């Protein structure tokens, strides 16, 4: 697989910005904007990379590096792409020990997303997160 799929520029994502925005519509728009930071990855769109439990089509792969873990994500839905970008911000280049400490439910609450996301979007985000963590932490 091409190394370029692991090179999304998520440096612009600042979770504090999201927390400071007033109102769900402003947050939703910001999440969609951040989703545009993820480049399209046609080579990732294969069944073996498909995220199970996500209502919209989403794909995920992983590789372990000397410094931690790298993930590549893609999705058809704008909001799921944005949520994937948020997830990447939290997990990209983290060590296994750091990933083990990550509490996805707490992240949804911290960003005030849990009460605003529909059940299907919330489930999609959780499916992405669980599959990412499983890929990283099941490495031998």
Feature roles, as predicted:
Residues 4-55, 64-67, 72, 108-140:
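N-terminal intrinsically disordered, cationic/polar leader segments
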Residues 59-61:
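Short beta-strand scaffold segments in enzyme catalytic cores
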Residues 63-79, 88-92:
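Conserved interaction-surface patches within small, structured recognition/assembly domains
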Residues 51-53, 80-81, 100:
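Generic structural signal for well-ordered secondary structure
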Residues 94-109:
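Glycine-rich phosphate/pyrophosphate-binding loops
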Residues 84:
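Primarily the active-site beta-strand->alpha-helix module of PP2C/PPM metal-dependent phosphatases
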């Amino acid at each position: 697989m091409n190394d370029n799929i692991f090179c999304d520029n998520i440096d612009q994502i600042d979770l504090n910005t999201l927390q400071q925005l007033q109102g769900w519509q402003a947050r939703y728009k910001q999440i969609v904007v951040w989703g545009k930071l993820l480049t399209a990855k046609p080579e990732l769109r294969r069944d073996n990379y498909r995220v199970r439990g996500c209502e919209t089509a989403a794909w995920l792969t992983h590789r372990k590096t000397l410094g931690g873990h790298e993930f590549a994500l893609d999705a058809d839905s704008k909001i799921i792409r944005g949520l994937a970008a948020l997830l990447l911000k939290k997990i990209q280049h983290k060590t296994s020990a750091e990933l083990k400490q990550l509490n996805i439910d707490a992240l949804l609450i911290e960003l005030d997303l849990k009460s605003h996301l529909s059940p299907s979007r919330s489930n999609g985000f959780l499916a992405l997160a669980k599959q990412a963590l499983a890929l990283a932490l099941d490495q031998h």
